Amino acid sequence: MMEETTKIPQATAKRLPLYHRYLKYLDESGKERVSSAELSEAVKVDSATIRRDFSYFGALGKKGYGYNVSYILDFFSKTLSQDKQTNVALIGVGNLGTALLHYNFMKNNNIKIVAAFDVDPAKVGSVQQDIPIYHLNDMEEIVRENGVEVVILTVPADEAQVTVDRLIEADVKGILNFTPARISVPKQVRVHHIDLTTELQTLIYFLENYPAKTE
């Protein structure tokens, strides 16, 4: 399914988790079908965009009927690899890393942090939220043992690149980078940068220059 996903526009790919989360809620609520208009209201994406997004995957719904919730939930679960558990490692257990350890990823999907790494003697060897914290020196071995291909990076910026180089040697394929460093990786490795300061600055800019329309 991942090969199919790579053929769709990136903007569509980014919206798939939104659809999946709401469809999971509908399924758990016992709802059997949903229209694009209902989805639009819930996820705040216009219905024409939703229909176009869904069209990339073939005929998922019927005109006048809408979409079968159970069917498209199962379809998107496979597309997003949510039909199996994805093991993730957290690199860096500072303030942000600790907060992420306490976030229940398994509540709405099959993403699980299976190991965390740090150099602080007070943290190494401890267990937080049932997640063991190992010394950074053991990172490559533990990552391989747990079949981890995706990591969350929250180390200090000046340690980011050397840490990433080691992760690549351990066959990591995806990095969610919370550091301000712009890291270099081979083309087969995917990096998503999450810079909270930049996101806030962007939000403030849009608030000041493109105020939301009032009714």
Curated annotation (Swiss-Prot):
Organism domain of life: Bacteria
GO biological process entries: negative regulation of DNA-templated transcription; response to redox state
Cellular localization per UniProt: Cytoplasm
Name of protein: Redox-sensing transcriptional repressor Rex
GO CC list: cytoplasm
Gene label: rex
Function, as annotated: Modulates transcription in response to changes in cellular NADH/NAD(+) redox state.
HAMAP family: Rex
Protein keywords: Cytoplasm, DNA-binding, NAD, Repressor, Transcription, Transcription regulation
Source organism per UniProt: Listeria monocytogenes serovar 1/2a (strain ATCC BAA-679 / EGD-e)
Keyword Lyase: no
Pfam family, one: CoA_binding
Residues bound to NAD(+): G92, V93, G94, N95, L96, G97
Signal sequence range: none
GO molecular function: DNA binding; DNA-binding transcription factor activity
